[in-house]
Amino acid sequence: MHKKVLSFILCFALMTSGCLEGSTPDMDGDGIQDSEDLDIDGDGWSNSEELNCTSDPNDGEVTPIDTDGDSQCDPNDLDDDGDSWSDAEEGRCGTDPVDSESVPDDLDGDMECDEWDDDSDGDDLPNEWELERGFDPMDPNDFISCHGEAKYCLRTYDDFTFAETHNAYSTIEDQVLVGVNHYTGLQRQWDDGIRAFMVDSHHSHYDHTSKEDVRFCHSTGQFFHPCNFGEVDALEWMRMLNSLMNNSSGDVVTLLIENYVPASHLSFLFNETGMKDRIYTHTLGDEWPSLGDLVIHGKNLIVFWEQSQHDEYPWLHDFGTFGWTTNYAESSKDEMTCTVHRGDGSQPVWHLNNWLSSIYGLPDPILANDVNEYETLLNRSLQCWEEMDNRPTFVAVDYWEEGEVTNVTITLNKMSHWSDEVPEHP
């Protein structure tokens, strides 16, 4: 009887202590029962990760393959070896996607392997373009720059915008007295980025009409010789331009000549100053060449004149046949338009004339400051680009020092279309 009582007490104690209850499964011994444990086998990989990686979540000795140790198993890792090149990229480039020491050749570091990179050396010139022109597409130091940027060398002449000075020679610095268009002469204009120049060619006097007597000057009325109130020796001016071009690289220059001398005298002027060999001759109807090709071939000067085409001098391009201009010398901004005033509006090369005249018909620095102001000139250029569906090739101004014509052209040249986001002010 006494033994039965003791047995009963012992069983009761065991039952109330829970010692006879069934044990809860906990494979990894982390104190979390398996039914609630996100990593049953305690191998550092969650159950779902192991299932996705075709690994056994119930075996702590079996873990997913993870070559680069980024806790992303290789079957689901876009970059198995962790070398920053995706497996797909390495496969395309012919390197081992599970060997971090095997990486694609990438000369310019743009994460596009050289084999598939159109610009392997990262100099903004396509490999094929460089090869065709004798440059090394694998040497970032072997390149050409046009107007300060290699990428502009790919642009055609008519797909670039040049700052242009109207009556470029008519300056206070050059001691012109009446009808002054600018404060400073050619050197300052060049230094600030002007690369297109409108000039007027006359003989120095009615009695001096030899080829050596060509001057740049312009008339202020019908009663006086055009050079009475100031002139610039055309030979000296052109020699300076030639020197500036010789000491520069990658610049394409344009002259628009309002001409009043024989074509043979202009030919003498260009020959005597060493400029003749620079001149590019365009064939009407052909596409304009790229800036790069003009520079490479040493034909980086384009000359237009305001006369009919001359068969003996085909390099003197009739501006009205090879291009067109807007109106000019209006009295107010409200009168300015974008439409064709002179020339063939179907041609891609054109001049956006942007200067006003005073009530006396003369250039006016105050009016120039108004229309050359950055936002004003930029907005007009974009408006005309949109309206004519063609970027202005030239933006021509009086008193270039007033306002920011060169900064406007810098901004325009950063854009491929008028609807692009406008870049920040240079």
Named regions from a protein language model:
Residues I144-P426:
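Catalytic cores of phosphodiester-bond hydrolases, prominently lipid phosphodiesterases
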